[in-house]
Amino acid sequence: MLVSDFHFNLPDELIARYPKDERTASRLLHLNGESGKFSDLHFSDLLDHINPGDLLIFNNTRVIPARLYGRKESGGKLEVLIERVLDEHHCLAHIRCSKAPKAGTKLILGEDKLGIGNGLEATMISRHDTLFELRFNATTPLFTLLQQAGHIPLPPYIDRPDEDFDQERYQTVYSKVLGAVAAPTAGLHFDNPMLDKLKAKGVNMAFVTLHVGAGTFQPVRVENILEHNMHAEYAEVTQAVVDQILATKAAGKRVIAVGTTSVRSIESAAQATQPTGKLIAPFFSDTNIFLYPGKTFKIVDVLITNFHLPESTLIMLVSAFAGYRHTMNAYQHAVQQKYRFFSYGDAMLINKNPNALNDLP
């Protein structure tokens, strides 16, 4: 199975660089995974496709202002993208600069927001492969410092500086647990009135946490996808969520994942539980689960997701869920119908293809 199997041509003008004025104003492409038929809807039509007793599972991670601009104490300019906060003063980060800093190098960060001479001071402690461990020298907790000095880390394909409105619109309305450096974008389409309507209809809701890392934007660098090393992200699935999933399955209702990060959290928990013979159990760990055509989904029945990058691990996940040909046909239709792509773009509603194992590249 080759990376090129998941290529499609995407005109640049279909990349959504700004969100719609209203969260629910996006379009929705409904793909029936079993038949391969699709229909063009609006996101507000989702209410007609979710039934009482179904369980919607959201990812409640909250994006941190993880991008910092600054300089080495010696003067060289640099850009820091925090990948993971380790504790109140330490983090792992990507650093872009002309020459990688050595251990002990002092960095001055955030002067563009805090003013010249008022920047945050950090020290490079050690290097871990492509990541740098930094210690921030202030007594103030790191999350607080980032709120003061950091920028919302918009994905590279949005290709513009972050603006004030991104602080709200690049977060889901239910985001709660700080830690992500990218938004779980399928959730961006939900506003509070829509959530209230779903609750009034008798739809159940649960929340997992997966802190989306910058690795989600990294290209697959091998031609044979079986050789790809998936990046790790931290995920939590609590006992309460497990109980809701088991009750939903027992009642013959559907588990609907909002976003690929919710899928990866739930299916990681199910995969880790396999040796015990249980369907699913609580999960608190890093996951590097890689779902591609030929892999099965033990829990998720329906997926709500945005349109993903060509040749990405996320379009591979969708292809595993809906079937390869059905997915690529739907993407071709989306391009022809000028759907908006990626984080601020439109969405898909996909019913799982029970025959996806027979629909491979």
From Swiss-Prot:
Localization terms from the record: Cytoplasm
Keywords annotated in UniProt: Cytoplasm, Queuosine biosynthesis, S-adenosyl-L-methionine, Transferase
Pathway assignment: tRNA modification; tRNA-queuosine biosynthesis
GO molecular function terms noted in the UniProt entry: S-adenosylmethionine:tRNA ribosyltransferase-isomerase activity
GO CC annotation, single: cytoplasm
Keyword tRNA processing: no
Protein's UniProt keywords contain Repeat: no
This protein's name: S-adenosylmethionine:tRNA ribosyltransferase-isomerase
Taxonomic lineage from the root: Bacteria, Pseudomonadati, Pseudomonadota, Gammaproteobacteria, Pasteurellales
